[in-house]
């Protein structure tokens, strides 16, 4: 079966042929490759072609595909039961690993997706603050719950407008949209809605408008505003937690959040996410408090076992993030040099094992900046790299990831492919 045939078959039964829209290659053109299996740093499609994978399941696989330790933990757990629907010491073990690492987190609760984590964190934050207003930032993605699917309408101080079909305006009326890395836009919302804002949520390292880190000064001023107006600050680290560093984004800004959300890496590739923070807020959750949150598969033993194996392996390797960042910098430096040689302007960014690039002549600080990137050039580059066996994120507004299964030789392979690709698309 060819990739085209497999994708055509998928479209008969699955909307758009995919279970998450970006996988359909809509923004880069062509049809997606259909994956048969994966191992280490590589994907293999149904036609037998091999790809160096810089997506790594959109971030979770920090050790690459089929890591032996995580694989063995999952297999062992399956033999003891895939789900109990009851408490298990494995939940406590993973919770302790995370709380011990992140000192601002007193307690944590597990869920099955990043969307659940952010949705639940916002609910308990509102329950604690007793105010409904929520500030989010343009370009930050916090999952697909209704209240967070908004874009800027007539400015940062107005109510948000739904940016997805099926989202009633009443659902987003308490969501206010601010500009990333622009503290004045946040001040204006607080000043104009002094008694309404109970929650602020932000990706400290945004990964869904490309890779765009928040400035240290901006985050510190955001913390001060939340304290001044009595709002709960949530740092969404579903992507950056245990990815940008062992402490997520914290070493880059040293700002303490009230709540933090996690996902991806903490599950070792399984469907695990979490939200945690100060005990006085987390104790508002049922059964101790009045804020209800639940999940059939939350904390299931297979996922917990994978997470324990992943975090334990991270903690046992003091040089892990040094190696990963070195490879990420080598890749982005290689892309810059290759683009320069072809007369193409590119901006790059690295945070630990995360990387991103924009085809623009200015530094990207927010969503409007990101939108000015040359997405047509990005699409051509993606197609040219895919043809050469390099699997990059099929959207300008996503982030790439390095895994520990990659070697310097793998990075050299990608850089050499980029040299050829840039010359091809420039011709």
From Swiss-Prot:
Keywords: Cytoplasm, Isomerase, Porphyrin biosynthesis, Pyridoxal phosphate. GO terms for cellular component: cytoplasm. The modification N6-(pyridoxal phosphate)lysine is found at residue 264. Pathway: Porphyrin-containing compound metabolism; protoporphyrin-IX biosynthesis; 5-aminolevulinate from L-glutamyl-tRNA(Glu): step 2/2. InterPro entries: 4pyrrol_synth_GluAld_NH2Trfase, Aminotrans_3, Aminotrans_3_PPA_site, PyrdxlP-dep_Trfase, PyrdxlP-dep_Trfase_major, PyrdxlP-dep_Trfase_small. This is Glutamate-1-semialdehyde 2,1-aminomutase. It comes from Campylobacter concisus (strain 13826). It is an enzyme of class 5 (isomerase). The gene is hemL. Disulfide bonds: none annotated. NCBIfam families: hemL (TIGR00713), PRK00062.1 (NF000818). Belongs to the class-III pyridoxal-phosphate-dependent aminotransferase family. HemL subfamily. It is found in: Cytoplasm.
């Amino acid at each position: 079966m060819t990739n085209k045939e497999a994708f055509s078959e998928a479209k008969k039964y699955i909307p758009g042929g995919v279970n998450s829209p970006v996988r359909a290659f809509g923004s880069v053109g062509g049809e997606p490759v259909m994956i048969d299996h994966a191992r280490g740093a590589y994907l293999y499609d149904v036609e037998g072609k091999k790809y160096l994978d810089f997506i790594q399941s959109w971030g979770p696989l920090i050790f690459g595909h089929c890591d032996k330790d995580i694989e063995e933990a999952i297999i062992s757990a399956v033999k003891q039961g895939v789900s109990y629907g009851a408490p298990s010491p494995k939940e406590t073990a993973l919770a302790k690993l995370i709380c011990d690492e992140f000192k601002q987190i007193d307690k944590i609760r597990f869920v099955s997706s990043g969307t659940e984590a952010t949705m639940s964190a916002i609910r308990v934050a509102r329950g604690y603050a007793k105010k409904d207003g929520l500030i989010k930032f343009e370009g930050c993605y916090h999952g697909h719950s209704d209240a967070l699917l908004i874009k800027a309408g007539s400015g940062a101080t107005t109510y948000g407008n739904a940016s997805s079909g099926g989202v009633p305006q009443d659902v987003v009326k308490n969501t206010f949209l601010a500009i990333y890395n622009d503290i004045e836009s946040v001040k204006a919302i607080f000043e104009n809605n002094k008694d309404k804002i109970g929650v602020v949520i932000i990706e400290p390292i945004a990964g869904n408008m490309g890779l765009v880190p928040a400035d240290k000064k901006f985050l510190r001023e955001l913390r001060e505003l939340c304290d001044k107006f009595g709002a709960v600050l949530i740092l969404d680290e579903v992507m950056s937690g245990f990815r940008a560093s062992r402490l997520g984004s914290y070493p880059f800004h040293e700002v303490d959040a009230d709540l933090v959300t996690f996902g991806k890496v903490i599950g070792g590739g399984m469907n695990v996410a979490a939200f945690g923070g100060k005990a006085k807020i987390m104790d508002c959750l049922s059964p101790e408090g009045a804020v209800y949150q639940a999940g059939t598969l939350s904390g299931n033993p297979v996922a917990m076992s994978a997470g324990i194996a992943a975090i334990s392996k991270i903690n046992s390797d003091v040089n892990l993030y040094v190696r990963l960042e070195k490879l990420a910098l080598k890749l982005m430096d290689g892309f810059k040099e290759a683009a320069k040689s072809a007369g193409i302007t590119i901006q790059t960014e690295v945070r630990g094992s995360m990387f991103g690039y924009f085809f623009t002549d200015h530094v990207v600080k927010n969503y409007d900046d990101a939108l000015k990137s040359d997405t047509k050039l990005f699409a051509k580059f993606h197609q040219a790299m895919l043809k050469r066996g390099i699997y990059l994120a099929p959207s300008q507004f996503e982030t790439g990831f390095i895994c520990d299964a990659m070697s310097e030789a793998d990075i050299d392979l990608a850089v050499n492919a980029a040299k050829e690709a840039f010359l091809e698309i420039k011709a």
